[in-house]
């Protein structure tokens, strides 16, 4: 895929808008009741689509537009809009989850480069997305370690910020990777 300046600008804004939309969209799975055909209930997974939108843009457009979209998103968050789970402004650097925010930049880079280094395949997109998720959690774990007062605090933070949301994120990244693969097929 040829990346021109206009391509980068367009995908940067698409990524930024997807990040904004993802913030307000919880990840829920429908549960169908065969006996009651009128009601569909939804299982709340406890996370939003922020990680998925970041990795989707990385796998579809590459590392550069995804990083620029994350930078725009961070700038808006710093200047007062509550775009992150932990709030906004410069105070968010004092939150234990700050490492995950920084990790989103590394994830954009890793997933975006990996998605384009080999021929397009679903397996390559899946590996790219999951490696990006790993980068987010690695940066997050380091940030938690730096923020923790003790080993016990770090373990409890790690459970709260990484282990509890991880199963939902694994499912969400799988579904997002399929969507990214289909988009890449259309764009190629």
UniProtKB/Swiss-Prot annotation:
Protein localization: Plastid, Cyanelle
Which Gene3D superfamilies does the record match to this protein? 1.10.1760.20
GO MF terms here are:
biotin transmembrane transporter activity
InterPro entries (alphabetical):
BioY
Which coarse location class describes where this protein primarily resides? plastid
GO cellular component terms, A-Z:
cyanelle; plasma membrane
The protein's superkingdom reads Eukaryota
Q: Plastid: present as a keyword of the record?
A: yes
Keyword annotations for this protein, in alphabetical order, are: Cyanelle, Plastid
What protein am I looking at?
Uncharacterized 21.2 kDa protein in psbX-ycf33 intergenic region
